Amino acid sequence: MWAFPELPLPLLVNLFGSLLGFVATVTLIPAFRSHFIAARLCGQDLNKLSRQQIPESQGVICGAVFLIILFCFIPFPFLNCFVEEQCKAFPHHEFVALIGALLAICCMIFLGFADDVLNLRWRHKLLLPTAASLPLLMVYFTNFGNTTIVVPKPFRWILGLHLDLGILYYVYMGLLAVFCTNAINILAGINGLEAGQSLVISASIIVFNLVELEGDYRDDHVFSLYFMIPFFFTTLGLLYHNWYPSQVFVGDTFCYFAGMTFAVVGILGHFSKTMLLFFIPQVFNFLYSLPQLLHAIPCPRHRIPRLNPKTGKLEMSYSKFKTKNLSFLGTFILKVAERLQLVTVHRGESEDGAFTECNNMTLINLLLKIFGPIHERNLTLLLLLLQILSSAVTFSIRYQLVRLFYDV
């Protein structure tokens, strides 16, 4: 049985501040509703018959509350150093890690809000987290600088027990930040999904950190909890308003904020591989979406499911294009995906010639293909259940299957 150790005072203070953050988030979002609408940061829910204007970019409120909690929390991990007799040397490396992590998250919230306001292109969406991750990588370089990994057992006869990746390790961490920020943004489009999946991931990380507090890397997991606990409660406050029927939209701001927060704790907490395992649905969704993201298959602006007004349920959305415009690679991918029952393809003739229509390649549409039309709230619940199951699989891999690859 897992036993959670007694929590240190800074974590209890962090928990108390996070509870206040939940109340603040729940209160501030409706209070600022009119301000966002007046600034035209609003839109219509495409999956509702109502054309009511709904405030967007509410992730900026959630992110602001999160930052205020942690700014106020900064002195508490170092309370012993306020009493000279209890502090032999100030832990500058811990302080730098805390400040650097906050800087990276703060930059990502700012850049995410800029994306919501300016509606940037996808190539810019890749550059933003790259820029915001630079403070994070510099903190890792100055505090740790370790780029050596333990090689899995099946490859040790070739590579040895340890392998120094050098600069490639920093490339990996930069790509991890880019992936985390965009993975949540790609798996989105229905009420409660962005905040819901982030809530499940953060809860899973909190459980993982608590289990590991009695291990050899206690300080790393305490550091992770400093961020995950306030993130969980502020996200819970956002989800309260974003749940079906949504009163607000979280915007790209929240997706970037959530992704960078996960990247920060995964990198500076030294559990990036476990972190990626918590993203199993997002990894699958990314790989499944890749043909459209790379435009091998035409990708419309919105790939969200479409509402059937008669049934009130969501159905698959489709991408329609001229068959002759599809490249050889796109044709090959589409045939393979169709053979594997991963897409539904319709072919026909129109006045403009032969056309092809296939469902948009997202995990949301794939579930609709498998289970048929589903009510939006139930579809969100199904996706969150999948996220919870993937976390259960992650814990099984981390504490059982890992023995096949590493000496634990």
UniProtKB/Swiss-Prot annotation:
Claim: rRNA-binding is one of the keywords in the record: no
Binding site for Mg(2+): N185, D252
CC cofactor: Mg(2+)
Any one of the GO BP annotations: dolichol-linked oligosaccharide biosynthetic process
Main localization category: endoplasmic reticulum
Record InterPro entries: DPAGT1_ins (IPR048439), Glycosyl_transferase_4 (IPR000715), GPT (IPR033895)
Regulation of its activity: Inhibited by natural nucleoside antibiotic tunicamycin, which acts as a structural analog and competitor of UDP-GlcNAc.
EC number(s) on file: 2.7.8.15
Chain ranges passing through the membrane: 11-38, 59-78, 92-118, 122-143, 167-186, 193-213, 219-242, 251-269, 272-293, 376-400
Enzyme class, spelled out: transferase
One GO CC annotation: membrane
Bilayer topology: Multi-pass membrane protein
Keyword Transmembrane included in the entry's annotation: yes
Chain's role: UDP-N-acetylglucosamine--dolichyl-phosphate N-acetylglucosaminephosphotransferase that operates in the biosynthetic pathway of dolichol-linked oligosaccharides, the glycan precursors employed in protein asparagine (N)-glycosylation. The assembly of dolichol-linked oligosaccharides begins on the cytosolic side of the endoplasmic reticulum membrane and finishes in its lumen. The sequential addition of sugars to dolichol pyrophosphate produces dolichol-linked oligosaccharides containing fourteen sugars, including two GlcNAcs, nine mannoses and three glucoses.
Complex formation: Homodimer.
Official protein name in the record: UDP-N-acetylglucosamine--dolichyl-phosphate N-acetylglucosaminephosphotransferase
Organism of derivation: Cricetulus griseus (Chinese hamster)
Gene name in the database record: DPAGT1
